[in-house]
Amino acid sequence: AHVDRLLWASSTSAAERWIAYTSPHRRPAFAAALATRLKAADADFKVQEARASADSEASLIAARVDALRASGNSFGARTLLANRSTLAAPAPVLKDWYQLLLTHAQAAKEDGQYDLAYRIASRVDDAVPAGVLMLDQDIATRDRYTSLTWLAGSVALEKLGRPRDAVAMFERYAAAAKSPQTRSKGLYWAGKAAAKANDTTSASRFYERASVFYESFFGQLALEQLRRPMPNVPQVAAAAPVIAAGSVPDVLLAAALASKYGSWRDQSNFFRAIALNADGKEDYVAAVGLSRKLGRPDLAVMA
């Protein structure tokens, strides 16, 4: 909804003008979110009026969490995120919703509040519209999603003694990953968690899937778990792409220019985008070749 996005962006004046045109069943939550953002005297009353929506509307939850944190009640903010209901509608800005969850889940983990950290970080699915694949999302959204699922999986496995929950999180991590390194990492750790849960069948299945990426570190660890030798790795010459307008993607041209004129940070941002968007052998060969041409071996490592 338009108002949902306005509230998410803290565009309170514009949101106030549009609230009257929203659907009756969502209007109380929008009014409560607006009152909370404005620090209105009746904000708490508006939240009570919203009833169940107070815990299921992303824009209202975010407003309440921010208000609690600003008042110094970080534990209350984390508890709200951990105990919330399933979202009534997809988050208005997915990457920002995930950043909200990640910020508080990481803080909870750092403070030793492992159950809270898991319950915040593991609630990733209800924010996504039905039928939408995380693999198709932009880099920022996928990065925050994988950070959340990795945090939830590692906490479940290492701190809470819940390996079956860890399996589900690591499998989500792998499903959202595009590079062989990150995909094999998620599958390998899903296998480790399944083995710890005494589910040897599932563990073997995850190791099998990870071992497909035998050129990566975790793919090789998966082969070790399966007691298989390393296959013969075909030698592929890494040829740098021709840097000419119209013949290569814009991001490669931008990386080449950044290597000549930009800062190290600018270069790294472009190289990271190239590595994260690589999809297929040709892309990885081109990335490694470009790293050699531009004198940036770290791009080869990223890829």
Q: Each predicted region: which residue ranges?
A:
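Cell-wall glycan-active module
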Residues: 1-303
